[in-house]
Amino acid sequence: YVALFYLVVKNNETMAQIGLIVLGAAFCLILDGGVIELLVKPLAERLRPINDPSLKQLLDIVPGTYENSFSFFSAHAANTFSIAIFFSLLIKNRLFTSFILLWSFVNCYTRLYLGVHFPSDVLVGLLYGGCIGAAVYILYNKVCKKLLFKKSFFSTQYTATGYAISDIEMVLIVMCLIILYTIFRGILCFV
């Protein structure tokens, strides 16, 4: 998240623009986490795979993994995917979109691997998060049009929305390092 914040600060001219993007990202997380944790999970009351007595013996649980709340549906999947969709629509760069979606999917995979969610929890989280990310971007776009924030760039060094390719590459390096760290930690669990 820090790398995304850096990208926003470095590539927007006014505090109003930066604030609106940060507010949009925060709105994604609040809508995801708030609705899921305060409304859906308590109503669904679905046990996590690692807490389900009928499944617990079938799972190879990673030591130190323990979750006390309910499973349906995955807030991690919804949060990361809503942020991925919001920033993909905001930045409009194919390589960035590919990496931020990969980051979200790796996060989702960890939820399955650790046994804290069923596949359906993750799929519903992705669907919900995608809808939230797109809806928040549409709202962000409408507010930008009212406030007359208009950027249009035609250069090989910038995206169509004015984000410097060099800054995007820095964020991609951070995402690659996070993904490599996740893979490395997964391998260490087997050693």
Predicted regions located by residue number:
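Hydrophobic residues in alpha-helical segments
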Residues: 8-9, 44, 112-113
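Hydrophobic/aromatic residues in alpha-helical transmembrane segments
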Residues: 1, 35-36, 83, 132
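Transmembrane alpha-helix/helix-exit interface in multi-pass inner-membrane proteins
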Residues: 29-50
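Glycine/small-residue-rich loop that forms an oxyanion/phosphate-binding "nest" at active or ligand-binding sites
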Residues: 51-52, 58-60
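Transmembrane helix-bundle signature of multi-pass membrane transporters/permeases
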Residues: 6, 26, 30, 57, ...
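Interfacial segments of alpha-helical transmembrane regions
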Residues: 5-36, 97
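Membrane-embedded catalytic cores of phosphoryl/pyrophosphoryl-handling enzymes
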Residues: 60-190
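Hydrophobic, aromatic-rich transmembrane alpha-helices
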Residues: 1-11, 80-88
